[in-house]
């Protein structure tokens, strides 16, 4: 067989889309998942409108270019991980393939990712776009959580390659806690947490707004985002952390320098409590969202307790982090400590209730962090799409023409998965 061109791996998220070729360790492009379109006035001569429609369809921009176009309407076709506008999504994919990857879609197999609990109909829509609009030879739709588990094999903490584990996937728009057993997601036990990267940015923006007057209002969001990415970390104890800043501020308070976009003058702000209060909303969500008060460690514990009893220990032993919002320093350590406390308290209680007759075996809680965390889903896809099995499990154009889009409702597990 002639040497194949590598597969294209595309991971579409709420905030950013990661894309590149299989076999690489990092995505070639990371672009905002938005599209800017010309919204022409809907009044006027119908014939004129019909003429313009074809032109308007070609007049659009995606990614960073879309954000820089003030005269266009900027749309985000994906909300909370799920595609909401398929027409825009098709145009978005068109530019991804031709402008960014510069690929001829007929020559490359494609691995696309989907969020947990994606509907079978959505898989069919994806198949229709890929096979009919782009004429791809083969398509595989992978669940993001399974790819994140595969990516965690690069960690030194992982002894054996397993596809059983609890994935905490926290991106820009949503955080999911997803239990996976032998490569299959336990759908009924998934929980989502309405706190993610964007909420942390908004919370830091609010804190800075209350305290710092020097930030230009139109730049307050990007300043908050920069502060979050540059200075934020997770602390082990809130009270001690506050006292650290109060007693020795010079050591802990950082300076952020920015440039006013209008006057081009520099401005500087002090970054203090915001450094640890931002990511703290994972563990104390009530700081930012009064309607949701369950810390992430409790959600993880509840998810695992809802799972079948025979997979609970392996799920505790392999808690895998994925996505940009899990990148805060010491996030994994704090999560491991909090989950361990909850688990140990439960074991102690069961021992007390049995009057000391039951001696429960301790449960090993391990949170896996690794250097591929930020793009874990994309990297997992890149690894699996460069294996020979990938081409055997892909749905081909021939299958699609024979059976129809329903073939993409089911995508077999493969690799070390099986």
Swiss-Prot record:
Annotated GO CC locations: Arp2/3 protein complex; cell projection; cytoplasm; nucleus; site of double-strand break
Keywords linked to the UniProt accession: Actin-binding, ATP-binding, Cell projection, Cytoplasm, Cytoskeleton, Nucleotide-binding, Nucleus
GO biological process: Arp2/3 complex-mediated actin nucleation
Pfam families per the UniProt record, alphabetical: Actin (PF00022)
Domain of life: Eukaryota
Gene3D superfamilies: 3.30.420.40, Actin, Chain A, domain 2, Actin, Chain A, domain 4
MF term (GO), any: ATP binding
PROSITE patterns reported for this sequence: ACTINS_ACT_LIKE (PS01132)
Cited InterPro entries: Actin (IPR004000), Actin/actin-like_CS (IPR020902), ATPase_NBD (IPR043129)
UniProt main location, coarse: cytoplasm
Signal peptide limits: none
Entry keyword annotation includes Nucleus: yes
Subcellular location per the Swiss-Prot or TrEMBL entry: Cytoplasm, Cytoskeleton; Cell projection; Nucleus
Function text: ATP-binding component of the Arp2/3 complex, a multiprotein complex that mediates actin polymerization upon stimulation by nucleation-promoting factor (NPF). The Arp2/3 complex mediates the formation of branched actin networks in the cytoplasm, providing the force for cell motility. Seems to contact the pointed end of the daughter actin filament. In addition to its role in the cytoplasmic cytoskeleton, the Arp2/3 complex also promotes actin polymerization in the nucleus, thereby regulating gene transcription and repair of damaged DNA.
Family named by the database record: Belongs to the actin family. ARP3 subfamily.
Protein name: Actin-related protein 3-A
Native organism: Xenopus laevis (African clawed frog)
Classification of source organism: Eukaryota, Metazoa, Chordata, Craniata, Vertebrata
């Amino acid at each position: 067989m002639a040497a194949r061109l590598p597969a294209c791996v595309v991971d579409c998220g709420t905030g950013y889309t990661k894309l590149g070729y299989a076999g690489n360790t990092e995505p070639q492009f990371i672009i905002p998942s938005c599209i800017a379109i010309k919204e022409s006035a809907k009044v006027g001569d119908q014939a004129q409108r019909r003429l313009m429609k074809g032109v308007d369809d070609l007049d659009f921009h995606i990614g960073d270019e879309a954000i820089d176009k003030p005269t266009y309407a900027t749309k985000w076709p994906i909300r909370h991980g799920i595609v909401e506008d398929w027409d825009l999504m098709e145009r978005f994919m068109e530019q991804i393939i031709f402008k960014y990857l510069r690929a001829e879609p007929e020559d490359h197999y494609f691995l696309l990712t989907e969020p947990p609990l994606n509907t079978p109909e959505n898989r069919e829509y994806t198949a229709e776009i890929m096979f009919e609009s782009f004429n791809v030879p083969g398509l595989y739709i992978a669940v993001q959580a399974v790819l994140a588990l595969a990516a965690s094999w690069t960690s030194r903490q992982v002894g054996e390659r397993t596809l059983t584990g609890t994935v905490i996937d926290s991106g820009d728009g949503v955080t999911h806690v997803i239990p996976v057993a032998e490569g299959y997601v336990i759908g009924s036990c998934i929980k989502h947490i309405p706190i993610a990267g964007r909420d942390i940015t908004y919370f830091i923006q609010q804190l800075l707004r209350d305290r710092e007057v020097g930030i230009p209002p139109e730049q307050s969001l990007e300043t908050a985002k920069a502060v979050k990415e540059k200075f934020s970390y997770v602390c082990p104890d809130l009270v001690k952390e506050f006292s650290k800043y109060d007693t020795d501020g010079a050591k802990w308070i950082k300076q952020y320098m920015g440039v006013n976009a209008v006057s081009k003058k520099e401005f500087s702000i002090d970054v203090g409590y915001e450094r640890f209060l931002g990511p703290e909303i994972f563990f104390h969500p009530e700081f930012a969202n009064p309607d949701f008060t369950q810390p992430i460690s409790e959600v993880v514990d509840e998810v695992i307790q809802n799972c079948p009893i025979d997979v609970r220990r392996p799920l505790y032993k392999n808690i895998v982090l994925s996505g940009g919002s899990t990148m805060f320093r010491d996030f994994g350590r704090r999560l491991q400590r909090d989950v361990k406390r909850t688990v140990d308290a439960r074991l102690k209680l069961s021992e007390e209730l049995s009057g000391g007759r039951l001696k429960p075996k301790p449960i090993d809680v391990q949170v896996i962090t690794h250097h591929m965390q930020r793009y874990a889903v994309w990297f997992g896809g890149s690894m699996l799409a460069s294996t020979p099995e990938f081409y055997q499990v892909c749905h081909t154009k021939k299958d699609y023409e024979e059976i129809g889009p329903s073939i993409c409702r089911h995508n077999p597990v493969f690799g070390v998965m099986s």
